[in-house]
Amino acid sequence: MSEYVIETKGLTKEYNGKRSVSDLNLHIKKGRIYGLLGRNGAGKTTTMKMILNLINSSDGEVIVFGKSMKKHNKEILPRIGCLIESPGFYPNLTGTENLKIFAELRGIPKRNAIKESLELVGLKYNDKKLFSQYSMGMKQRLAIALAVMHDPEILILDEPINGLDPIGIAEVRTFIRKLCTEKGKTILISSHILSEIELIADDIGIIDNGVLLEEESLEELKNMNKKYIKLVAHNDSKAVKVLEACFNIKNYSVEKNGTIKIYDLDLVIPELVRELVNEGIAVEEIRMKEDTLEDYFKRITGGAGIA
């Protein structure tokens, strides 16, 4: 039996001869939160739709619970809850009344399932507030309550914090983590917001232009970040000449803002400062630093697009 609850093998999607997702190999472990991170248009939603069999892949395979999704979708899909696009709730009904309609359509025992799912996301069963009066955060909560109402083993959530204010984001993040730690759900969540994925995910896949660039646990990704000496000098070009001529330093980079990152950690900082001052170069800042996850993501995706 595979250790992965969801696995994709060479998953590919083409539209009019152009690939939106290319040869994707995801590995999602049971009882963990997997964050699919990428800029808008990177292929996150398309990937989730293929996993859920909502759209056909052009090539490749989706394996869920050790079985082919294409061959066994009728058996697999009832064990999955999802939020890909906002459900069509009735604006003039309460949250509970809306869920009752969906429960009846799906043949779910109403009261207990609805009450438990609402409580799980912090909404009240007897609340008389209409859906049209809900805040964005409450609407997202209700959508996730609908996704978990049938007690699925897997949750697939596409950008669940999109459009929320900071309080709403924190609330949604808290109960998603609760679903994993207390209920044992396996959760696949997508986002273009790095800081949120960093706060919630156990494992991260980085997708860009439909290609999976990296897949690691959050802990491993943090360990991959480089330590360096940050140098901000009045004249970066002259400072670089000192590094090369006086200290034989070759392993460095110069940022667009003039900041110099020195990756040779054997360099003695006081000696460097003394030499720079002797050359008439004012030192504004020098200290040991470590690349953040944002630095790493920008480096492998080639720049902007991830908040």
Regions found by a protein language model. Give the residues of each.
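Short, Lys/Arg-enriched, disordered terminal segments
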Residues: 1-4, 302-307
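ABC transporter nucleotide-binding domains
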Residues: 3-8, 13-189, 194-208, 212-214
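Alpha-helix N-cap/helix-start and coil->helix boundary motif
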Residues: 12, 96, 120, 194, ...
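Generic alpha-helical secondary structure signal
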Residues: 19, 111-115, 170, 219, ...
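Alpha-helix boundary recognition
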Residues: 65, 78, 198, 222, ...
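Generic structural signal for individual residues within well-ordered alpha-helical segments
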Residues: 77, 99-100, 115-118, 170, ...
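ABC transporter nucleotide-binding domain
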Residues: 174-263
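Short, charged/small-residue-rich alpha-helical element at the C-terminal edge
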Residues: 227-300, 307
